[in-house]
């Protein structure tokens, strides 16, 4: 009961200076959700009260906690991110037909990203948060050019219910996209096994000095069913060219 009264008083004080009821409630609620004790709640809300009274706070720069939430968290950004996830999911016909579920999933994905990045210490909160959201948005995009829609493992699992939206944030790339990860791993393995030993030959003529004293090596830079690329180096002038 005392906590409830304290929260109402803080909202009143903040709004008195901000003159923005929606923003005031967002700030107060965010501080309350992030704090697991009344002491931490007061610790988070204190900078706002001070900034409001000194008129240093604006509606664009709203939240600061010296180390864990630096420099500022733009609360409106969370709404923008949620809308980004919503629009990405809506590209799939399943979510076009299930708008409520699409909204729920977009909110849960964003919330999980927010709480996940809140725990990270190495980077600034905003940098880590926006990076993580961008990665997941790319992964669940069914219109990606990198693969066909049926190969989108993460999106298909979301639709089938096998994967919950809030689970995305804690998964590795290999877990989110096993097909793409396996393909990438296979390509790396094959290329690492290539024979790249240099050989000497007079078959290739240097376009620079016109001599036929070159070393060459074969590298599989394209698909496996296409011929290897021949990289040549002239022993006379050092010019490098493709044979």
Curated annotation (Swiss-Prot):
Entry's transmembrane regions: none
Keyword Zinc attributed: yes
A Pfam family per the record: Zn_ribbon_TFIIS
GO biological process: DNA-templated transcription
Keywords recorded for this protein, A-Z: Metal-binding, Transcription, Transcription regulation, Zinc, Zinc-finger
Zn finger (TFIIS-type) start-end: 202-242
Gene Ontology terms, MF aspect: nucleic acid binding; zinc ion binding
Keyword Protein biosynthesis (UniProt): no
Domain TFIIS central: residue ranges: 77-201
Binding locations of Zn(2+): 206, 209, 234, 237
Family recorded in the similarity comment: Belongs to the TFS-II family.
Function, in words: Putative initiation factor. Necessary for efficient transcription elongation past template-encoded arresting sites.
Name listed for the protein in its UniProt record: Transcription factor TFIIS homolog
């Amino acid at each position: 009961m005392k906590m409830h009264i304290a929260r109402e008083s803080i909202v009143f004080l903040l709004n008195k200076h901000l003159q923005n009821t929606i923003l005031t409630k967002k700030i107060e609620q965010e501080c309350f959700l992030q704090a697991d004790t009344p002491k931490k709640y007061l610790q988070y809300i204190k900078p706002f009260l001070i900034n409001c009274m000194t008129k240093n706070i604006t509606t664009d720069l709203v939240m600061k906690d010296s180390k864990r939430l630096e420099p500022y968290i733009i609360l409106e950004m969370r709404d923008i991110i949620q809308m980004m996830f919503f629009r990405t999911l809506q590209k799939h016909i399943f979510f076009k037909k299930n708008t409520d579920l699409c909204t729920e999933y977009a909110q849960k994905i964003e919330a999980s990203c927010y709480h996940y990045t809140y725990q990270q210490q190495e980077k600034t909160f905003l940098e880590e948060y926006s990076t993580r959201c961008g990665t997941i948005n790319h992964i669940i995009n069914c219109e990606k050019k990198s693969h066909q829609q049926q190969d989108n493992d993460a999106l298909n699992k979301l639709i089938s219910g096998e994967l919950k939206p809030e689970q995305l944030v804690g998964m590795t790339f290999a877990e989110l996209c096993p097909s793409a990860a396996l393909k990438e791993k296979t390509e790396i393995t094959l290329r690492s096994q290539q024979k790249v030993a240099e050989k000497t030959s007079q078959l290739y003529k240097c376009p620079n000095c016109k001599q036929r004293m070159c070393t060459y090596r074969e590298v599989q830079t394209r698909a496996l069913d296409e011929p290897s690329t021949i990289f040549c180096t002239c022993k006379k002038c050092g010019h490098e060219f493709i044979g």
